[in-house]
Structures are given as C-alpha cells and as structure tokens.
C-alpha cells in the first residue's frame, strides 16, 4: 500500500479521478493524498468519491489540498 501520493499531472477531472481511485484501492488507514493545482479541476467531485474509501480533507491551501484516509 501507498502511504503518500502527490498528484501533479493531468488537470482534467476525469484523469485525476482515475488516478485517485487507482491509488485509493492501494491505500490504507493513514495514507495521505496531496493534490497540486486542485482549483483547476472539480476537486469537490473527487473528494466526494474518495469518501467511500474513508478519505477526509485535512488541509487546504491556495493551490494544494491534502486528504487522509481515516478508516
């Protein structure tokens, strides 16, 4: 499983969602996802999808957001 994933690549919601779900399936409690330039795509939609894996937003800044798997 991955403990930390930094997303800094495609800026299309569909592409980011595909990557996030792929890594979420390979994560565990405590895994953190950091998304760069999250205002360029629909982060609300992605974060909502990740809640089914137990991810919650723990910090957000100007262009980065961090989610952590709580369960």
Residue locations for each model-derived region?
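C-terminal substrate-binding/active-site "lid" region of AdoMet-derived donor-dependent transferases
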Residues: 13-71
């Amino acid at each position: 499983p991955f403990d930390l994933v930094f997303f800094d690549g495609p800026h299309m919601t569909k592409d980011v969602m595909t990557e996030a779900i792929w890594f979420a399936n390979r994560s565990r409690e405590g895994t953190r996802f950091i998304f760069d330039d999250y205002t360029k795509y629909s982060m609300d939609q992605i974060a909502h999808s990740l809640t089914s894996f137990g991810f919650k937003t723990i910090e957000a800044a100007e262009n980065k957001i961090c989610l952590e798997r709580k369960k």
